[in-house]
Amino acid sequence: VMDEAHTVEDTASEHLGIRLSPLGFEHWLRRLLTPDTGKGLLGYLRAGPAAQTVARLWDAVADLFREVPRAAGLAARDGQKTVTGPLALESEVPDLLRELSGRLGALIEELEDQDEESRSELRHLRGIGVALGGMLDAFLAQSLPDHVYWIEREGKRRQPVLHSAPIEVAPILREALFGQVKSVILTSATLAVGGRLEYCRDRLGAGEECELL
C-alpha cells in the first residue's frame, strides 16, 4: 500500500539515482576517523593501516569536490549545471575507497571472536564506502543507462552535490515492483486525470491491469 501515491514518481527518481555530497562523505569518514583528534572507530581500534587510508581520503575528497565543478564547467555563481559526458579529471578517491574496503575487510577478519560490536559497525561502514565508490564511479563515467547527470550547489555553503536520476522510472518500477508484487494499492486524491488513470499508469509503469476504485 502506497499512500500519497502522486509522489511515487519523484520519490522513485530520487532513490534510484545518485546523490553525492561533501557532507555525506565527511559524515561517513568522521565515523571512521577524524585525523586531527583521533576520534572514530579506527582510532578506538588503533587500526593503523586503515586509519592512514582514511586520512588520505579526507584530503582526496576535499580535492574531488573542488575539481568536479571545474571539470564540469560549473562557475562559482552558477547554481546548477547539467553534465553531458564523462568528466576528465584525476582523483585518488576511487582507488582509496577500494583500498580502504580491503583494509576494513582484513580488520574485520582480525577481530573475529573478539569484538562483535566493532565488527558489525565495520561491516556497516565498509558497505557505505562500497556504495559511495560505486556511485562515484557511475557518476564520473556516466555509466548508468538512461540517466541524466548534473551538479547542484546546495546549502548555505553552496557546496557542489553530484546528482543523477533515471529519465523514466516506469520501466524500473514495472520490473521491480508491479511485475513482482501481486497486488499494489496506490492511494491519492490526485492520481486520476479527467477521471482516468492512463497518465499515472504510464508514468509509473503500472500496466493495463491498473484499476480505479
Residue ranges and their predicted role:
Residues 1-213:
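ASCE RecA-like P-loop NTPase motor cores
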